[in-house]
Amino acid sequence: ALVALGHLSGEPRYVEAAERAVRRFGPSIVESPGGYSTLLEAAHDLEHPPAVVIVAGPAGAGDAGNGEAARWMLALQRSYRPWVQVYRQPRHDAPGPLVKGAPPAVGARAWICRRMTCLPAVDDLAALEAALSRVEPG
């Protein structure tokens, strides 16, 4: 979680904290990997950073689950991409320091990020799917 938080927030200290934790527990991980699955996942994400998709948009009229952004989330979940993490930006919050542009007033918008760099916003689900088809594993 620290790796993803660091990449989403643009705060290297979170990534550095994850690196320290993995190094600190390295010998224990080798002895008993089953007991350290979360740290193994962090080590993997440090070595092979996943792409992160941030989906933003207002909720649907009267129902937070029926907006365009919710439809995009469902569409993105249909594809198997273990090297891509998808997050829904809550309400009208700013999408974070790494992305350029504001959440849309209507419809949906998404950003694809890796490490601490985000591509320009995508305002079309088909274009987002096409861009994700070109994203390689970390």
Write out the residue ranges for each language-model feature:
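Glycan-recognition and catalytic cores of secretory/periplasmic carbohydrate-active enzymes
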Residues: 1-138
